[in-house]
Amino acid sequence: MESTAAILLRKRKFSDTSLIVSWCTESFGCIQTIAKGARRPKSPFAGKLDLFFEAEISIVRSRKSDLHTLTEVMLKNPFAGIRNNYLRTQTAAYFVELIEICTERDHREPELFALLHRAFGYLDANDPTVRAVSHFETELARIAGVHDEKKLKADPAFALGNLFGRLPLSRTPLLKTLATEAKSRNSSK
């Protein structure tokens, strides 16, 4: 059994009683786990598996596949502020989508976990801005090795899109909404 800090990216139904849970972890990279019995009323996972939660997880690695068994979850930070505002939730979901596109499963990248943790910490306390989204994309492009701010003035999102073949479809509507929010904030001052 192995333990690591992790942020819950996505969860979906596997069976009547179990869930498949995707995590961005500090020690193992982005992984998928099966939470057996998580959908039962008296599950030890009850209240601990929600989107964007940070937790200390214990897993048993699978020898046959990339679907590991989740054995324990200790909630560290629910990032509750993200859920207080639709735009914060939308931005966090975009960050998760972007990470899922730009990373391979089970590829250890501690910088990626640290970036997502900082981003969620920011969204937990602040409303998102175009600048915050751009910073996240720039840092992700730097981690992926496709953007060096000193050498390139190019758009880091464009570099990520070229490397991985696409960007999340949610990017354009998110940026439009953030730009509209910024204009309305500036005009009310």
Region roles according to the model:
Residues 1-189:
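Non-catalytic alpha-helical scaffolds and adjoining flexible linkers that form interface surfaces
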